[in-house]
Design a protein with these regions (language model features):
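Conserved N-terminal segment of class I S-adenosyl-L-methionine
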Residues: 1-171, 180-184, 248-249, 282, ...
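Conserved catalytic loop of SAM-dependent methyltransferase domains
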Residues: 25-32, 74, 244-269
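Short, glycine-/aromatic-enriched active-site segment of Class I SAM-dependent methyltransferases
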Residues: 26-36, 199-225, 230-236, 259
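Membrane-proximal basic amphipathic "stem/tether" segments
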Residues: 1-6, 214-216, 253-300
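Hydrophobic/aromatic residues located in beta-strands of well-ordered beta-sheets
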Residues: 129, 197-199
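Short catalytic micro-motifs in class I SAM-dependent methyltransferases
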Residues: 171-178, 222
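A short glycine-rich, Lys/Arg-flanked "PGG" loop and its adjoining helix->strand segment in the class I
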Residues: 181-196
């Protein structure tokens, strides 16, 4: 596959600015090194990315040219999946920050994976839950009692009625969207008055990124934009959300997963993971601040 055939120039995906700054990080991806996990979640970091520029208006770092929506639909639909255990760890972490809304009736998750967070939503009292997931490999690993709540395919706002959702959650997915602003604007229409959007994203300005530079796992060929607190606030407030709150979180995963993210040679990580997989040490959970942000915003209760 020639990936260059599926790339197109774009304006800033957050503010729409046509202003062009110089390339911040030149593309360094080698198509020959991409495999079936290239568009999978929680994979071994490849440390490859597209041309990245910073918007001089809203400060988001974004890829241009970037993959077309048609290519992304195909790529994510056929992506492999091998992070079932980590998904449950992440879901429990994110469940602790579920926003308070007037009602806990209807919740929607975009990019639900194996549906782990849908289970947490049920525990939190939401009566009706729905997850949208393009990867059949991911959704096929869902627990039987939750699989019926997962819709296959890419998220399309038109599939849901306006003002029908109390909470829309979207975790580690905003970076992958060709048009993240469209998702936020659509969410505002789908939410009931007083409803909330709940996002988890990487933080381009985090201490981890400053320390590791382009060896940080957030530099990835599937990440079409990298947010910071300022660009996230700009995005949500300009889309009409109120009471926007952004905070740094601590992720909790088994020790073996943290080593998968470490800036070590891939061969060394594979060997280390095999060793840890055969011991109890690898299963020890550890909470770390690796530069992820939890973001919440509310639709006006008067709308």
């Amino acid at each position: 596959m020639n990936l260059s055939e599926h790339l197109r120039e774009r304006n800033c995906p957050v503010c729409g600015s046509t202003a062009r700054s110089t390339i911040l990080h030149p593309a360094n991806f080698n198509e020959a090194h991409l495999d079936e996990f290239a568009f999978a979640s929680r994979k071994l970091p490849e440390l490859m990315h597209l041309d990245l520029v910073r918007c001089p208006i809203c400060t988001v770092v974004y890829a241009s040219p970037a993959f077309t929506p048609e290519f992304l639909c195909s790529a994510y639909g056929g992506a492999a999946y091998d992070s079932n255990e980590e998904a449950y760890f992440a879901a429990r972490t994110y469940a602790s920050g579920i926003p308070l809304t007037p009602n806990r009736s209807d919740a929607l998750e975009v990019g639900t994976g194996n549906g782990a967070f849908l289970i947490e939503l049920k525990k939190a009292g939401f009566k009706n839950v729905c997850g949208v997931e393009p990867s059949s490999a991911a959704s096929n690993t869902a627990q039987p009692q939750i699989r019926e709540f997962i819709r296959p395919g890419m998220f399309r706002a038109g599939d849901f009625a306006p003002a029908s959702v109390d909470l829309l959650a979207c975790f580690q997915t905003m970076e992958h969207l060709e048009d993240p602003r469209e998702l936020c604007a659509s969410t505002l229409q789908l939410l009931k008055p007083g409803g909330a959007i709940y996002l988890i994203t990487h933080d381009y300005d985090s201490w981890v990124t400053r320390l590791l530079g382009r060896k940080s796992p957030i530099f990835d060929v599937e990440h079409l934009q990298l947010f910071s607190k300022s660009s996230l606030r700009y995005l949500l407030e300009s889309c009409g959300f109120e009471r926007v709150e952004i905070r740094t979180i601590r992720n909790r995963y088994p020790l073996s997963y943290w080593f998968r993210l470490a800036p070590l040679p891939r061969a060394a990580k594979r060997l280390l993971n095999r060793v840890l997989a055969g011991t109890r040490i690898g299963r020890i959970p550890l909470s770390l601040n690796i530069g992820n942000l939890a973001v919440t915003g509310y639709k006006s209760s008067l709308r």
